[in-house]
């Protein structure tokens, strides 16, 4: 349930803070959110897939850590990111 290289490039372009930016928290959270959304769709039809569920929980935890970092360092960017990706907090 991974995302294609083209889709990943679109996400990076839409969320990059400058040219060539692939490591900023905004880009990382956007990519993780896309992967999480893909996996939640997978679980609607494969409810007993516990191995993938563990991977989903790991992705959510990683995204949560990045969001905590962003909130600690720049709350305005944090709030904008939550709003842009419709992430509940």
Curated annotation (Swiss-Prot):
One of its GO terms (cellular component) is cytosolic small ribosomal subunit. Pfam families: Ribosomal_S15. One of its GO terms (biological process) is translation. Signal peptide: none annotated. One of its GO terms (molecular function) is rRNA binding. The keyword rRNA processing does not apply. One of the primary rRNA binding proteins, it binds directly to 16S rRNA where it helps nucleate assembly of the platform of the 30S subunit by binding and bridging several RNA helices of the 16S rRNA. Belongs to the universal ribosomal protein uS15 family. Part of the 30S ribosomal subunit. Forms a bridge to the 50S subunit in the 70S ribosome, contacting the 23S rRNA. This is Small ribosomal subunit protein uS15.
């Amino acid at each position: 349930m991974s995302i294609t290289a083209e889709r990943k490039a679109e996400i990076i372009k839409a969320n990059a803070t400058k040219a060539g930016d692939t490591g900023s928290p905004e880009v990382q959270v956007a990519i993780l959110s896309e992967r999480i959304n893909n996996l939640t769709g997978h679980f609607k039809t494969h409810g007993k897939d516990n191995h993938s569920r563990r991977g989903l929980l790991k992705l959510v935890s990683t995204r949560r850590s990045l969001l905590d970092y962003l909130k600690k360092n720049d709350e305005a960017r944090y709030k904008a990111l939550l709003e842009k990706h419709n992430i509940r907090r």
